UniProtKB/Swiss-Prot annotation:
Protein name stated in the entry: Small ribosomal subunit protein uS14
Keyword Ribosomal protein in annotation: yes
Source species of the chain: Dictyoglomus thermophilum (strain ATCC 35947 / DSM 3960 / H-6-12)
InterPro entries, alphabetized: Ribosomal_uS14, Ribosomal_uS14_bact, Ribosomal_uS14_CS, Ribosomal_uS14_sf
Superkingdom as given in the UniProt entry: Bacteria
C-alpha cells in the first residue's frame, strides 16, 4: 500500500502535464504498469486470480 504522503502528492494538481506518470492505483508501484486496468502486473495478477476483474481469464492452450 502506498504511503499517505505519496497519495496526497499524486492527488495534487500538477503544474505541468508532462510531470504526470503512471502508477498502480492499489500499491503505487511505478514499474510493470498495465494502462488498460491502471494496475501494476502484481496487483493485476492477484485480482485476476481472485476473479475480481471482469472479462479476464487465465490463458490455457
Amino acid at each position: 500500500m502506498a504511503k499517505k504522503s505519496q497519495i496526497v502528492k499524486w492527488l495534487k494538481p500538477k503544474k505541468y502535464k508532462v510531470r504526470e506518470y503512471n502508477r498502480c492505483r492499489i500499491c503505487g508501484r511505478p514499474r510493470g504498469y498495465i494502462r488498460k486496468f491502471g494496475l501494476c502486473r502484481l496487483c493485476f495478477r492477484e485480482l485476476a486470480l481472485k476473479g475480481e476483474l471482469p472479462g479476464v481469464r487465465k490463458a490455457s492452450w
